[in-house]
């Protein structure tokens, strides 16, 4: 979609806010990933899976010919693929806590990328999702296929008691299946596995003295064939995988954060966006991301950090406001200007047929991945502008958590009707239900301004001050002793106009009555 239709999309994905390259890791031996492509994966030839039960049996017999008949190699895991057909089936898979990839695990990768879509699956449907599950996995009622029975050795007491060097057997399976080149020279020399670890960082040129800091709470995943591991970075970007490996690995960031939000991507039908980090040794990979990195990767990491920061700061000893709902879904639209907090995934209901008529190519996404937050990234090219936008939309999400869907539906209806009538989603401020918009936007612009100042210093920016709803009311109160927590506490579902806000503030803070009356007298006719 182009031009004006993008604007309509932003308005209909409600609460639109009309506001005035990767570098190599620093660790020794870490591969440079500067030139990794981030489009569709290109598959090569199918490979022989060394972890197939029969291949591990052959490797055992090759190294321990006298023990092969005494030690049975039984399947420990299943290499499978699922074909979910709707949102419920995707959620069922997500709740199973298994690592899903949208491409097969036993193919050579000719060209790295962030996504793959099986050519035999319709473009508007979810593609096959590949996974490795325990042999006793309780399969949900979702179409699936078992590709291989696998034996994936671990460090359990049962395996150690056999007296067999299973690491050597695993390496031999790679050799016998023609995959010796995928083994790492380090592990071949030392005959031992390595635990992947590293650090993922990002640079905000306007903060932290321009020094890199961690990409926080993001999921890091790696695999060699069907041997998987994943973990989350800590707040400083460090990670350590829970498993050891002897082969070279493919690494990726999965934008599903430990704080309870995921970042999706338009027209890529996966629950959370994936950014490949490419191939590296089993010792791990590190990466420093900057504004000159691949654009989608940079934006995803900024949105990730901004949301992590916001949610972390909602706690009692900091901002002391309700955090956004758990399992928050954010979409980044790289070709849109406007952002929104539509909260569809959490129950805000708009005429979906009407929205779909405007969404065009994006309509098919609604039935799979209803968004809560949409981030228009077209002109948000630097860290600071993206950070500001995310804070604004998450302020809306906190407000939603307090007032509920009934309030939000009226808010959305006003936005849509205002755009239809006037071409401005904020309207004229006098139409029915204008108060919902006025209060919601005042709160979001106010909190956005505070968080921007707290991150970047200087004076408080005047975001939104030219609009009819005057967010400077909250700033005025803040400067005179009512902080963001005090203000947020009165933004309840029964407060829908500036007059009701004034009354609620006076009831809650009678000692500030004079100041409250002064500011409302100045900005409210």
What do these predicted ranges mean?
Residues 50-57, 61-63, 196, 201-226:
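Short, ordered, surface-exposed loop/turn motifs in non-cytosolic proteins
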Residues 401-433:
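Post-HEXXH active-site segment of zinc metalloproteases
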Residues 37-40, 44-60, 64-70, 74-76, ...:
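Pan-zinc metallopeptidase signature
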Residues 21-157:
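Long, solvent-exposed N-terminal ectodomains/accessory regions
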Residues 343-386, 390, 394-404:
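Active-site scaffold of zinc-dependent metalloenzymes
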Residues 394-411, 443, 451:
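Catalytic Zn2+-binding segment of zinc metalloproteases
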């Amino acid at each position: 979609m182009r031009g004006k239709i993008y604007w309509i999309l932003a308005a209909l994905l409600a609460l639109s806010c009309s506001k005035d390259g990767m570098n190599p890791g620093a660790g020794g031996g870490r591969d440079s990933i500067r030139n990794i492509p981030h489009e569709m994966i290109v598959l090569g030839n199918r490979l022989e899976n060394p972890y197939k039960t029969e291949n591990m049996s052959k490797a055992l017999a090759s190294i321990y010919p006298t023990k092969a008949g005494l030690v049975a190699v039984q399947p420990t895991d299943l290499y499978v693929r699922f074909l979910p057909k709707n949102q419920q089936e995707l959620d069922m898979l997500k709740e199973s806590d298994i690592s899903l990839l949208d491409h097969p695990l036993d193919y050579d990768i000719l060209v790295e990328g962030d996504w793959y879509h099986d050519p035999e699956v319709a473009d508007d449907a979810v593609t096959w999702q590949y996974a490795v599950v325990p042999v006793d996995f309780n399969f949900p009622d979702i179409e699936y296929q078992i590709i291989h029975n696998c034996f994936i050795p671990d460090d359990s007491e049962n395996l150690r008691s056999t007296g067999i060097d299973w690491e050597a057997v695993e390496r031999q399976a790679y050799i016998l299946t023609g995959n010796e080149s995928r083994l790492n020279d380090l592990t071949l020399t030392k005959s031992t596995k390595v635990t992947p670890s590293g650090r993922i960082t990002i640079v905000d040129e306007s903060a932290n003295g321009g020094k890199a800091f961690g990409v926080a709470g993001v999921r890091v995943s790696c695999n060699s064939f069907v041997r998987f591991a994943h973990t989350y970075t800590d707040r400083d970007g460090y990670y350590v995988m829970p498993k050891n490996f002897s082969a070279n690995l493919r690494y990726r960031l999965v934008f599903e954060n430990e704080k309870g939000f995921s970042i999706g991507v338009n027209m890529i039908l996966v629950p959370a966006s994936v950014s490949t980090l490419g191939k590296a040794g089993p010792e791990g990979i590190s990466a420093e991301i900057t504004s000159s990195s691949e654009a989608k990767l940079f934006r995803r990491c900024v949105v990730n950090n901004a949301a992590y920061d916001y949610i972390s700061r909602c706690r009692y000893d900091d901002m002391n406001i309700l955090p956004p709902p758990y399992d928050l879904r954010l979409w980044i639209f790289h070709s849109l200007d406007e952002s929104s907090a539509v909260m569809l995934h959490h129950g805000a209901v708009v005429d979906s047929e009407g929205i779909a008529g405007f969404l065009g190519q994006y309509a098919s996404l609604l039935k799979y991945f209803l968004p809560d937050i949409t981030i228009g990234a077209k002109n948000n090219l630097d860290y600071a502008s993206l950070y500001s936008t995310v804070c604004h939309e998450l302020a809306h999400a906190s407000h939603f958590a307090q007032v509920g869907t009934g309030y939000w539906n009226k808010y959305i209806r006003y936005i849509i009707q205002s755009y239809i009538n006037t071409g401005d989603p904020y309207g004229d401020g006098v139409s029915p239900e204008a108060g919902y918009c006025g209060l919601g936007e005042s709160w979001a612009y106010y909190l956005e301004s505070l968080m921007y100042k707290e991150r970047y210093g200087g004076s408080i920016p005047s975001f939104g001050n030219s609009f009819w709803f005057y967010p400077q009311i909250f700033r005025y109160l803040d400067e005179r002793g009512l902080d963001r927590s005090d203000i947020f506490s009165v933004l309840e579902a029964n407060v829908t106009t500036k007059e009701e806000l004034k009354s609620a503030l006076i009831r809650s803070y009678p000692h500030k009555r004079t100041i409250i009356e002064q500011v409302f007298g100045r900005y409210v006719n």
